[in-house]
Amino acid sequence: MNLSESCSLPSGITVFERGWLSANNVLLQDAEGATLVDSGYVKHQAQTLALVQHALQGRPLDLLVNTHLHSDHCGGNQALQTHYPDLHTWIPPGLAQAVQHWSEDALSYKPTGQNCPAFHFNGLLQPGSTHRWGDMDWQVHAAPGHDPHSVILFAPEHRLLMSADALWQNGFGVVFPELEGVDAFDEVAQTLDLIERLNPATIIPGHGAVFTELAPALALARSKLEGFAQNPERHARYGAKVLLKFKLLEWGQISKADFGDWATRVPYLNQLHQRFGQGLDLDTWLDMMLAELERSGAVQVEDGMLQDA
């Protein structure tokens, strides 16, 4: 973890750049209160709490906001709610009922084979609304594509965008609806068009460093999107490898046999194999995905053990 300091940010805003297992967290402070945007993955919940406590220097955290409810963005919610009993939590409206009833299927945690402790919410982050955090007005914009219920946050006075997983410097997040066979590439394109219209000068992505060069990031994202739209199998293989790599990031090291036992029980991986497995059995197809990760340097395989790399 490191604080993103390569780009100048307004006072009152702190970015905790986390990596790829946990999404970045953004802390906004002013005289009225302290707001945190996104809370990372459950494995890092103690670190998330420690970072927030250190930055707040004894003042309470008043509000927790989630851009969307993938496990790497809200896995620290429960720990923060436990430590700060008066904390309010706002989520985008699309999955409010799923959170109320804690449906791990609807929330994607079972389909992805990931973990997220149950949390509650007090309010909804409605697209079209504006909120004042960190002495800045933040507009909430719907940003479907990567996740149908995701939002992005834009402060027009400073031309500052929290883009979540709709835009990174090197692309964008897996288009999860497509993994389920739901067309969503057009929504990704529309969200990229929205970001272009907002024309931010500084972008705080869900993963990776804060950056300022919007045009090349959009060009790269659109190029990747075109490739995926023209060849959905390419996106499916990418999505499968992301799911496998994410779990390797979580575990660090695991036997290939145990990893295979986990992978064969992951619904998304089974669905992708059924649609794009080219007639191979599931174990063979998963071995192919692991071999591609190994060739790219994302995993090391030795003596029956998998090591995250």
Outline where the language-model segments fall.
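Conserved beta-strand hairpin/beta-sheet module of binuclear metal-dependent hydrolase folds
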Residues: 2-56, 152-164, 169
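Short Pro/Gly-enriched beta-strand edge/turn motifs at strand-loop
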Residues: 7-13, 109-113, 134-136
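Divalent metal-coordination and catalytic microenvironments
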Residues: 28, 38, 68, 80, ...
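Metallo-beta-lactamase
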Residues: 34, 41-43, 137-230
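Aromatic/hydrophobic pocket-lining residues that form the small-molecule binding cavity
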Residues: 74, 188-189, 286
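C-terminal regulatory/interaction regions
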Residues: 236-309
